[in-house]
Amino acid sequence: MKFFIWLDLGMKQKNILCFGDSNTWGFPPDCGARYDRQTRWPGVLQAQLGEGYYVIEEGLPGRNTVWDDPVEGGKNGLEQLVPLILSHMPLDLLIILLGTNDFKNRFSVSPLDISWSIGRLVKAARDSGHPILGEAPEVLVLCPPPLADLSNSPFAGILVGAEEKSRQLASVLGAFCEENNIRMFDAGSVVQTSQVDGVHWEPEEHRKLGVAVAAQVQAIL
């Protein structure tokens, strides 16, 4: 009997929570219907990892890192993160892909501000262990790719000056994560933002990210 219990524990499914914004939710550049599960990058990640893993999607359009949104409301990632972690425990890994919505005019924050904000999310995750529900998960931060040309985008009016800031984020966030012992992968190394709206991704980019993140996950777990 003890042998079979040990075998079951050895084959335990690994649970992964993907916490992000509209690009995790599956918002298409043409503002059409949401991408299906198989197209969205967490779904691609699930397919790449296989049956030994369970990938949970928590993407919310408009979600930012730590800010109360005075226009849309309900988009503060820090307020939502720990309740979501607890609701999905036990968790082995949390993947955070946020920062793009922080570039909105209404927040007026810099790439360094965003890096510190992501640091707060990581700290909250690392402190989320519960005596009954489970231990705190490992954390992987994904830096969002730079925005594309916004001149003809429906989002141009709320992202004034965001293109240049978004191009700076990978280096600033990378330095911050290295200094604070946080795992980070630059999604911009494999993903190109669509020229259609300058913010969201075509299906092929979701596929590229899912494949790349699978390699990161396997190295961690």
Regions found by a protein language model. Name each.
Residues 12, 74-221:
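Alpha-helical cap/lid subdomain in secreted, periplasmic
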